[in-house]
Amino acid sequence: MFLSRRLIVSCLLLAAGCFAIGLWSLQSGAVPLETGQIIAALLGDAPRNITLVVTEWRLPRVLMALLIGAALGVSGAIFQSLMRNPLGSPDVMGFNTGAWSGVLVAMVLFGQHLTAIALAAMAGGIVTSLIVWLLAWRYGIETFRLIIIGIGIRAMLVAFNTWLLLQASLETALTAGLWNAGSLNGLTWAKTWPSAPLIIVMLTGAALLVRRMRLLEMGDDSACALGVSVERSRLMLMLVAVSLTAAATALAGPISFIALVAPHIARRLSGTARWGLTQSALCGALLLLAADACAQQLFMPYQLPVGVVTVSLGGIYLIVLLIQESRKK
C-alpha cells in the first residue's frame, strides 16, 4: 500500500520530537545531567545516586507521559471518528469526569489503593459512557444528541465530585485536589500498576479494531453492506476509548484537551487520516511530554500540575477550532 511522503515524514518527526524532549526531560531538573550520564545510568554503569535519579525518579515520569499521552490521543481519535465531529472527545463528553468520579469514590472508601483506584476509574468511565449511550439512543445514535447529553452528564458529575470532596477527610481532599488538576508528579514504577499494562492492552485492542473504524467512517449503510455489525463495532470502539481514558485518569488524573487536540494536529501535519491512530498516539505523547516539561521548568523550583498547562493551551486551540467551524457554516 502506497504511503505518502508527508505522512511518513510527519510520523518520523513526531517520534523524533518525543525522543528529543524525553532525553531533555531526563537531563533537566534540580540535578542537571549530561547525555553520557543518562546512558550510563540506563546501562547500570553510573554511580548509585545518578542511577536513582534517572531510573527511579525521571524515567517513570517520562515513559508514563508518553504512554498516557498516546492513550489520550488514540481515545480522542476514536471518539472523533465515531462521532464524525471535531468536538467528539472524552473530556468534552464527560467520560474522563466519570472516571474521575470513580477515582474519588475509591479514594474516599479505600484510600490510595492503586488497584481499587484503577478499577474504580474503569467502572466510572464505562458506567458514564453507558448512561450517555442509553440516554442518547433513539433507534440509533445521533451525534449531536450524544454530545449534548454527554455535556449535561459531565456537569452533573462535576457537582457530584465537588460534594464528594466536601465529604472527604482533609488529607484525602488535598491529595484529590492535586490529582484533579492532572499531575505526573511522584509517579514511580510501583504506581504504574495496573493502569499502565491496561493501557497497553487497550492500545492493542484499538489497533485490532482500526479496520472496523475505517469502514464505519464510510457510513453506516456502507459498513453494514461490507459485513460490519455497526452498533456492536461502535460500542466496542467506545469501550476501548473509554478504557484508555479511564486508565490514564487513574494514573495522572483527568488531563484535559490532549484527546481533543492531538487528532486535529496529527491530521494537519500529515494531510490525511490514514494511520490516524498511530499519528494521534505520537502527537498525544509529544504534546503531554512537552506540556509536562513546561510544567516542570517554567516556574522552577515550583512545579505546576501538567493539567494546568494542557487546559491553558487546549482552551486557546478550542476557541480557534470553534471559530473555524462557525466560518465554514
Predicted regions and their residues:
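Alpha-helical transmembrane segments in inner-membrane proteins
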Residues: 1-329
